[in-house]
């Protein structure tokens, strides 16, 4: 457990010691909130469903950007061999890196708290739906993070890791759409619903 915490601190600190982490947070919050605000003024209701409808597609792009450097950066900075010589299991290393990326993602998602705050000032939105939407987004983000860390471990280049993770996340996004589900249901009854 001590090894997991040390890797967690090291990697989480790396997100916030460079401006890249802050830029990522600002861009994600700006795009996600901006898309919601434009929809909100088109259909003025105290509802966050349009916000959560857009998030999976945004996560398909932003999560690979977070995970592409996780293992590739270790190889580039020649710290890969040093990490392997530490007295820790590979699972501890992976869990520490995953938790660091997940906490960074959760903090980024927490920065979007302005959206429900705005809704509560304008009306009476459903708190359960908002909490459920954020919880579902955290789970989807954790899944995409796991995919990104997996593919980053196989790729030596950050860009290749980004593209492979992006395409895989997008494939899973498409599988969840109504169009693909109805197509699967036509071919194999009951599987798409």
Stretches found by the model and what they are:
Residues 45, 164-193:
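Terminal transmembrane helical anchor/hairpin motif
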Residues 70-100:
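Helix-loop-helix units of permease transmembrane domains in multi-pass membrane transporters
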Residues 10, 14, 73, 85, ...:
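Transmembrane helix-loop junction
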Residues 19-38, 54-63, 167-171:
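Hydrophobic alpha-helical transmembrane segments of multi-pass membrane transport/permease proteins
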Residues 53-73, 108:
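Long, hydrophobic alpha-helical segments
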Residues 1-21:
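Aromatic- and glycine-rich beta-strand/loop motifs that create alpha-glucan
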Residues 35-37, 48, 58, 100-160, ...:
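Secretory targeting signals
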